[in-house]
Amino acid sequence: MFHLHVNLKYFLYPAPMDMRKSFYTLSGIVTSVMKRDVQNGEVFIFVNRRLTIMKILHLEHGGLVIYHKKLESGVFKLPTFDEELTSQVIQWHDLMMIVRNVKPKKRLLKKR
């Protein structure tokens, strides 16, 4: 059923996504904007403007799957990335921290 794991490649779409979009529109964005192929088994992550809803698009055996998470409170804490990019590569561990709503660690700066 849930076939996401550490050996897959994960791509975060940097722009806010309208969460009314589903399989066809998200697949179109993967192809036309992100310049990736949804059929190759990679995982594509979309988040809404308010950072309260996430959709994960992935091809599994038998067809496309969308995992959909809506937070009851709080917001997803995304890593910082260059907004000029069409997609941001993230690691499995980072995705799990985002889904569990744990802020990715930042480098601590020492006071001078």
Regions of interest found by a model, annotated:
Residues 1-112:
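Polybasic/polar functional segments that serve as interface/processing modules
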